[in-house]
Structures are given as structure tokens and as C-alpha cells.
């Protein structure tokens, strides 16, 4: 049986929707994330900043933690949207490695004129643990 192609454009569009909910009152760096489960549910996340900066959460971890807390544990793809199609931070890379495994990671900007498709191995060649 052939593996069905992932509709990454829809996933990116959903990450753009999530980005609109970002709370980035200090950095004004808004990020949205859309995580596709193995049963085709899309879980959204956005970055949420705090004056106590270490309490800030990235969009990727918000989406992943939300999915895990809802009982999802198998995933097909993740899309992350920021102004410059930024790569995930170190802690997000580690969480992607631990909980999502080897799935495509799509990085884009709101105009969707730049799309990078990466693997966690490319982003985190030497994971912790």
C-alpha cells in the first residue's frame, strides 16, 4: 500500500492561523505551529511570552505538549511558521526528537514564499540522552 502524501500546504496554513494567536508582547516574534497526528488531527500551538522570560513557551512545544496531553502519541508531520522561517530552538529540537521522531519538519513564513523541509537528524545531529 502506498503511503499517502502529506498535505504540507494545509499544515502550513494552519500554522499561520495558530501564529495569529501568538502572545509575543516583548519580542514581537510571532510563531505558529501545526502538528499532524497519525489519524489526521491537527493540533495547533503558538508562542506565549512572559515577563519572567524563562517561563516563555515556544509554539512547537505548546503544540507537542497539547497533543501529548490529549493522548496523541504518533505523528506524521509538523509545520512551523515565523517571519523568517526560523529553525526551532535547542529545547524544541530535543522535544521533537524525543516525542515526534523521524517526521518531516516544514518551516515557512506567512507569505509561504519560503518553505524548508528538514528532518530532526538535520536539525539535531547529536541529541541529548
Where are these regions (language model features)?
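Short beta-strand scaffold segments in enzyme catalytic cores
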Residues: 30-37
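Zn2+-dependent cytidine deaminase-like catalytic core
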Residues: 44-129
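Short, compositionally biased leader-like segments
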Residues: 1-13, 110, 117
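Short, basic/aromatic recognition patches
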Residues: 9-24
Amino acid at each position: 500500500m502506498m503511503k499517502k502524501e502529506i498535505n504540507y500546504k494545509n499544515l502550513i496554513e494552519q500554522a499561520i492561523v495558530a501564529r495569529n494567536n501568538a502572545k509575543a508582547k516583548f519580542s514581537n516574534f510571532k510563531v505558529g505551529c501545526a502538528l499532524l497526528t497519525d489519524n489526521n488531527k491537527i493540533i495547533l500551538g503558538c508562542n506565549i511570552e512572559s515577563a519572567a522570560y524563562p517561563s516563555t513557551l515556544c509554539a512547537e512545544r505548546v503544540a507537542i505538549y497539547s497533543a501529548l496531553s490529549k493522548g496523541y502519541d504518533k505523528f506524521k508531520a509538523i509545520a512551523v511558521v515565523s517571519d523568517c522561517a526560523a529553525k526551532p530552538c535547542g529545547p524544541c529540537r530535543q522535544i521533537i526528537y524525543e516525542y515526534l521522531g523521524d517526521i518531516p519538519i516544514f518551516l515557512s513564513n506567512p507569505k509561504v514564499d519560503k518553505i524548508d523541509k528538514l528532518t530532526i537528524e538535520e536539525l539535531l545531529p547529536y541529541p541529548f540522552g
